[in-house]
Amino acid sequence: MPQRLQILYNTVIVPKLQKELGYTNIHQVPRLEKIVINRGLGDASQNAKALESSIAEISAITGQRPVITRAKKAIASFKIRKGMPVGLMVTLRRERMYAFLDRLINIALPRIRDFRGVSPKSFDGRGNYTLGIREQLIFPEINYDSVDQIRGMDISIVTTAETDEEGRALLKEFGMPFAS
C-alpha cells in the first residue's frame, strides 16, 4: 500500500519540482533512493546485552531487522579484533523508507529538546543529506523504561539529486524543517 509521502511525491512534488527546476521529463526530477540508519556501538564487543537492546530498538524504529557491522581490521588501542561487532545498519527502501521519513519529519524531530530545525549545511555535495540524532527517545516506538543507555544514530537520506540545491528542494517539499 503506498505511503502518504509517496502519494504526495507522485501527485504534488514531482510536477512542482519539474516546473521549478525546469525539467522536461518527470524522470529527471530528483527522488528518494534509500534511507540508511547507522548506529556505532563502541561497547558492543564487550557488552552483548548492548548489542541485543540496540537491535531491538532499531527494529522497532524502522520495522526492519538491522545488519551487524563488523570491524574490518584489528585496532589494539580500541581493544577490537577483526570481525568483532562494532555497529548496526539498516537500509530502507520503497514503502518503509517513506513511512520512516514521515515519522521522522512529523513526529520524531519535533520531539527533540530545543529544536529549531535541522542544519541546511549537512548535504554532501551530491544531493544526499545526513543528520545525527543524539538520543533514541525521540521516536515514539521506544519505551522510556526499557532503555538501558541513551544512544544516538546517523540517518542518511540518499536522493537521485545531482546538486545540494536540488536535494534541499526535494526534502523541503517533503516537509523537512530546515533551520533558517
From Swiss-Prot:
Pfam families: Ribosomal_L5 (PF00281), Ribosomal_L5_C (PF00673). The keyword tRNA-binding applies. InterPro entries: Ribosomal_uL5, Ribosomal_uL5_bac-type, Ribosomal_uL5_C, Ribosomal_uL5_CS, Ribosomal_uL5_dom_sf, Ribosomal_uL5_N. GO terms for cellular component: ribonucleoprotein complex; ribosome. The keyword RNA-binding applies. GO terms for molecular function: rRNA binding; structural constituent of ribosome; tRNA binding. It comes from the Bacteria. Signal peptide: none annotated. One of its GO terms (biological process) is translation. Keywords: Ribonucleoprotein, Ribosomal protein, RNA-binding, rRNA-binding, tRNA-binding. This is one of the proteins that bind and probably mediate the attachment of the 5S RNA into the large ribosomal subunit, where it forms part of the central protuberance. In the 70S ribosome it contacts protein S13 of the 30S subunit (bridge B1b), connecting the 2 subunits; this bridge is implicated in subunit movement. Contacts the P site tRNA; the 5S rRNA and some of its associated proteins might help stabilize positioning of ribosome-bound tRNAs. Belongs to the universal ribosomal protein uL5 family. Part of the 50S ribosomal subunit; part of the 5S rRNA/L5/L18/L25 subcomplex. Contacts the 5S rRNA and the P site tRNA. Forms a bridge to the 30S subunit in the 70S ribosome. This is Large ribosomal subunit protein uL5. The lineage of its organism: Bacteria, Bacillati, Cyanobacteriota, Cyanophyceae, Synechococcales.
